[in-house]
Amino acid sequence: MVERIAGTILDAMPRLSEIIRTERVVFVFGFPPCTDVAVSGARWFEEKRKADPHFQVRAALVAEQCRMVGMASGAPWGFENPVSVFSGIFGKPNYTFHPHEFTGYCADDNYTKKTCLWTGGGFVMPSPHREEGLDAPDNRIHMAPPGEERANFRSATPRGFAMAVFHANKPRENLSLAAA
């Protein structure tokens, strides 16, 4: 069962504590919002800092909550973000990838977007699995036109990578699990 828990760690702690004590947590992964930390948006940092001196701390707290839950559960864990100020907060990422490296799982992910992963708890980084015969990866993330859906489009987790991570980290005693 996949359970998404929204809110701060303080809001979620009663349910998280129950899950960690009574259920088998098999994987924890976080997707901190990149709007305030990705270097692609650095030109707006000063303006944001004037409005809220702690704007990047708030984003880092999401990542830290993921790390804390992962460590408490004992399960493999990670969080992702594009190239960002997180390297200065959490250190060098454990891994990086581009979506096109996993087109063997989803050919629609044939694009570039360097994404960093900070991981622990025995997380296994999947080996690249590229679909043969595809054209060179495109630059759709950087070329996305302005609009209401631009941020959602740019921040969507590549399906091929998600499937690869699932297969690399799924519980070994139940090999019949399938990706949703």
Task: List each language-model region with its residue ranges.
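General small-molecule cofactor/ligand-binding pocket signal
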Residues: 5
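Conserved acidic residues
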Residues: 2, 26
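Class I S-adenosyl-L-methionine
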Residues: 8, 12-24, 34-178
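A conserved beta-strand element that flanks and buttresses the S-adenosyl-L-methionine
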Residues: 29
